[in-house]
A protein has these predicted regions:
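Membrane-interface helix-loop-helix junctions at transmembrane boundaries of multi-pass membrane enzymes
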Residues: 22-32, 79-94, 233-249, 283-287
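Alpha-helical transmembrane segments of multi-pass inner-membrane proteins
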Residues: 103-106, 130, 149-173, 187-262, ...
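Membrane-embedded alpha-helical segments of multi-pass membrane proteins
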Residues: 7-17, 43, 60-79, 122-130, ...
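Transmembrane helix-loop junctions in multipass membrane proteins, especially transporters and channels
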Residues: 53, 83, 110-114, 140, ...
Length: 288
């Protein structure tokens, strides 16, 4: 009971990051836009699982559509406040075509799904193209890049703390958040694998893969690659870094995460980024 109540810090954090980001965007303070992206989205599934396990299913729909509301409101305000539309490049046109193409299938009588199911699927598919246009229309000068980097590094450290707890107890964090029950009820996915979660949480031989507070180990590994890219930038500009201790902790956190997420692709990416880093700083002897 106590653990369940303590875990509510995740949905509360999600809600606070959403509210703070919406308020900032409404006021035109786009420098705070990243708060929801960094502090909210990574714990989205975990927050929903915890709400479900605490019997708070009534508020889950509000959380489920919050990210779409954030995207639509942010994009709408950006377009409304634009002095003039930008010149569209080939990637912009590709994204627009993609959204229109997928929207057509909502109206066409194809497949066994009803209109509601198609609209929900379209909502999920369109999320990242709309997110792309937010980044496309944002003026980079309005963003606080250094704060964004710091937020991502702090996220990596917190992820490693949860991961360290998983390693000490040899227990997936998702087993106490209600992950399996949530997926079974809302997505009709029966628990699979040796640990009652899904096969994604283990590799051959039943060796555990850990996800920290992310939705699954693959998402955990992918987020670590973003952290690594920022670490490379920070290490190259180490003399200008105002948070050397945070940089060090983030390095340790990324190593821990990339090892125990057990993702071959992410490990290869980690080694590739490390190789490029040593090439950039002209320390080729370390590589051999």
């Amino acid at each position: 009971m106590i653990i369940s109540l303590l875990l509510l810090v995740f949905p509360i954090t999600y809600l606070l990051s959403f509210s703070y980001s919406i308020k900032a965007v409404w006021a035109g303070n786009y420098g705070h836009l990243s708060v929801f992206l960094v502090a909210g989205l990574p714990i989205y599934i975990t927050s929903l699982s915890i709400l479900h396990s605490n019997g708070l299913d009534a508020v889950i729909p509000l959380f489920q559509y919050s990210k779409e509301l954030w995207v639509l409101l942010t994009l709408g305000l950006l377009v409304y406040r634009l002095p003039a539309l930008p010149t569209w490049n080939w990637l912009d046109k590709f994204m627009i075509t993609y959204v229109i193409y997928t929207a057509v299938f909502v109206l066409l009588p194809i497949g066994t799904f009803g209109v509601v199911e198609k609209v929900v699927a379209f909502k999920n598919i369109s999320f990242f193209p709309l997110l792309y246009f937010i980044g496309r229309l944002l003026n980079p000068e309005l963003l606080w890049i250094s704060k964004l980097q710091k937020q991502i590094l702090i996220l990596a450290v917190f992820a490693a703390i949860i991961l360290f707890g998983e390693l000490l107890t040899n227990t997936h964090f998702q087993t106490i958040t209600g992950y399996s029950s949530f997926y079974d009820k809302y997505f009709l996915f029966d628990p699979t694998g040796n640990y009652g979660l899904s096969w994604t949480f283990e590799i051959e031989g039943g060796i555990k893969r850990f996800a920290s507070f992310f939705a699954n180990p693959l998402e955990h590994a992918a987020s670590t690659l973003i952290t690594i890219a920022l670490l490379v930038i920070g290490l190259i500009n180490q003399r200008q870094t105002k948070e050397p201790q945070l940089l060090l902790w983030a390095v340790l956190a990324s190593v821990l995460s990339i090892i125990f997420a057990l993702s071959r692709a992410s490990l290869a990416g980690y080694l590739l980024v490390s190789y490029l880093f040593f090439q950039l700083i002209r320390q080729r002897k370390i590589l051999f």
